């Protein structure tokens, strides 16, 4: 397994906490499908700053414990603070590990493995490798669950076809290097190829509508728009978008603009996530 990126060097805990708040309506739906209730021990692989640990602890019940792994020490530090704040330190063990290597656990150790928004193709060009490791450390009859937000299929400008088409073109260009094997829409296939049975795939949607809460507004404005607004013009034109079209798109989301879409009383965005659940054969 290899990647040019060293995830331990990255610290985006503030963005992750806002992202977790933004995604809350989808997490509620996703968690309701998890077969984790009453389990003794699970693994949160790529736990980040730990935003989902309180919900996972609540879901499994008072007896359950969670091992939470991440490569980033900064994220683990934030997760530690969160666990202290939520009085979960006796139930959660945090550990630094690289998911691109063999996991430091015996075969069949956990009842379940949960991995949310981690197996991005840029970090994991061959997701079958970590997924096989997740299956190895899960007990027979236990479950491996892969969750992915699908920003590329989500809608930032529903009802505004011109902006939506431009944004879609930008996202399509951005995702052009994905292959069948590492495309996150195929997360259920990763589980099947790694030997799981009874694989199910679920889709979840949510809408954030005007008036947006300050967290949602911050996520859309500073993180989503902040991400694409930084794109150099040569990459924008390579995506088939002219400079004028791009400026119109940026103007529509500029916070100081009187026409900023996020301030419109009828604005809404629609987000999508996918989740696949597989069972390790007994
Ligand atoms: C987008 S965050 C998701 C965090 C968390 N699962 C959540 O949903 O809130 C991705 C996390 O994966 C971690 N990560 C990325 N590559 C990794 C690797 N090779 N080994 C361990 N963790 C990794 C990052 O440090 C980051 O915390």
Task: State each model region's role.
Residues 145-218, 222:
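Conserved catalytic/acceptor-binding region of the Class I
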Residues 43-45, 49-101:
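Class I SAM-dependent methyltransferase SAM/SAH-binding core
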Residues 103-113:
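A short acidic, Gly/Pro-enriched loop at the edge of an enzyme's catalytic core
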Residues 4-5, 12, 202-265:
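C-terminal helical/coil "lid" or tail adjacent to the Rossmann-like core of SAM-dependent
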Residues 21-40, 55:
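Conserved alpha-helix/loop element of class I SAM-dependent methyltransferases that forms part
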Residues 111-126:
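A short SAM/SAH-binding and catalytic strip from SAM-dependent methyltransferases
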Residues 2-24:
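Class I SAM-dependent methyltransferase Rossmann-like catalytic core
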Residues 128-140:
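A short glycine-rich, Lys/Arg-flanked "PGG" loop and its adjoining helix->strand segment in the class I
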């Amino acid at each position: 397994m290899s990647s040019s990126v060293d995830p331990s060097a990255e610290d985006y805990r503030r963005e992750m906490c806002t992202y977790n708040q933004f995604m809350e309506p989808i997490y509620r739906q996703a968690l309701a499908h998890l077969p984790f209730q009453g389990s003794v021990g699970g693994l949160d692989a790529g736990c980040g700053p730990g935003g989902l640990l309180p919900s996972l602890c609540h879901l499994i019940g008072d007896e359950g414990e969670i091992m939470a792994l991440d490569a980033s020490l900064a994220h683990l530090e934030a997760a530690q603070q969160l666990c202290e704040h939520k009085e979960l330190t006796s139930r959660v063990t945090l550990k630094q590990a690289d998911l691109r290597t063999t996991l430091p656990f015996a075969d069949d150790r956990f009842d379940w493995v949960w991995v949310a928004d981690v197996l991005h193709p840029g970090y994991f060009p061959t997701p079958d490798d970590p997924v096989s490791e997740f299956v190895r450390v899960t007990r027979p009859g236990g479950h491996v669950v892969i969750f992915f937000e699908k920003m590329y299929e989500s809608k930032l400008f529903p009802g505004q076809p011109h902006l939506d088409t431009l944004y879609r073109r930008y996202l399509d260009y951005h995702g052009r290097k994905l292959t069948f094997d590492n495309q996150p829409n195929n997360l259920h296939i990763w589980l099947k190829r790694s030997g799981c049975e009874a694989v199910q795939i679920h889709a979840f949607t949510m809408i954030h509508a005007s008036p947006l809460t300050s967290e949602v507004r911050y996520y859309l404005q500073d993180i989503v728009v902040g991400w694409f607004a930084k794109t150099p013009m040569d990459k924008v034109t390579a995506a088939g978008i002219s400079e004028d079209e791009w400026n119109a798109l940026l103007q529509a989301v500029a916070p100081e603009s009187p026409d900023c879409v996020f301030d419109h009383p009828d604005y809404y965005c629609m987000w999508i996530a996918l989740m696949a659940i597989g069972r390790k054969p007994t």
